[in-house]
């Protein structure tokens, strides 16, 4: 898998912006990606040194449209902690 295929998009929420001070960045990643693949992808794309990766899996929610039921896509979210001597990822700057 290519690094750009592993990292889908940044997750910008109130909680994810509050942990930016601790050099923790939140991304939505491919559901098949491992922690090691996420680490190498972040280091390749943003040119930073990753200290730790935490991942969370989310099941798809049941959604109904009248009598038809289906599920939303399952998701995988990664919180990436970069080292103290790494530069900030400018992707999140406003």
UniProtKB/Swiss-Prot annotation:
Keywords: Ribonucleoprotein, Ribosomal protein, RNA-binding, rRNA-binding. GO terms for molecular function: rRNA binding; structural constituent of ribosome. One of its GO terms (biological process) is translation. Coiled coil: none annotated. SUPFAM superfamilies: Ribosomal proteins S24e, L23 and L15e. Part of the 50S ribosomal subunit. Contacts protein L29, and trigger factor when it is bound to the ribosome. NCBIfam families: PRK05738.2-4 (NF004363). This is Large ribosomal subunit protein uL23. It comes from Listeria welshimeri serovar 6b (strain ATCC 35897 / DSM 20650 / CCUG 15529 / CIP 8149 / NCTC 11857 / SLCC 5334 / V8). The lineage of its organism: Bacteria, Bacillati, Bacillota, Bacilli, Bacillales. The gene is rplW.
């Amino acid at each position: 898998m290519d690094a750009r295929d592993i990292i889908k998009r940044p997750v910008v929420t109130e909680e994810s912006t509050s942990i930016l001070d601790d050099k923790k960045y939140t991304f939505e990643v491919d559901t098949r990606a491992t922690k090691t693949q996420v680490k190498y992808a972040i280091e390749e794309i943003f040119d930073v040194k990753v200290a730790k990766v935490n991942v969370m899996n989310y099941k798809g929610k049941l959604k109904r449209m009248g009598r038809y039921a289906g599920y939303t896509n399952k998701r995988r979210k990664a919180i990436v902690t970069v080292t103290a001597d790494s530069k900030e990822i400018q992707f999140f700057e406003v």
